[in-house]
Curated annotation (Swiss-Prot):
Keyword Secreted belongs to the record: yes
Name of the protein described by the UniProt record: Bomanin Short 1
This protein's encoding gene: BomS1
Species name: Drosophila melanogaster
Tissue-by-tissue expression: Hemolymph (at protein level).
Coiled-coil segments: none
């Protein structure tokens, strides 16, 4: 049972990292809550 919990935490961690890093050709665009083409987040400007 402990092995199952460790695997679950590992998989959830991978999903969190995959969601935090958008797979887009331009790393300057950060996708937040949906399909955003030109969302540049730099110092709130």
């Amino acid at each position: 049972m402990k092995f199952f919990s460790v695997v679950t935490v590992f998989v959830l961690g991978l999903l969190a990292v995959a969601n935090a890093v958008p797979l887009s050709p331009d790393p300057g665009n950060v996708i937040i809550n949906g399909d955003c083409r030109v969302c540049n987040v730099h110092g709130g400007k």
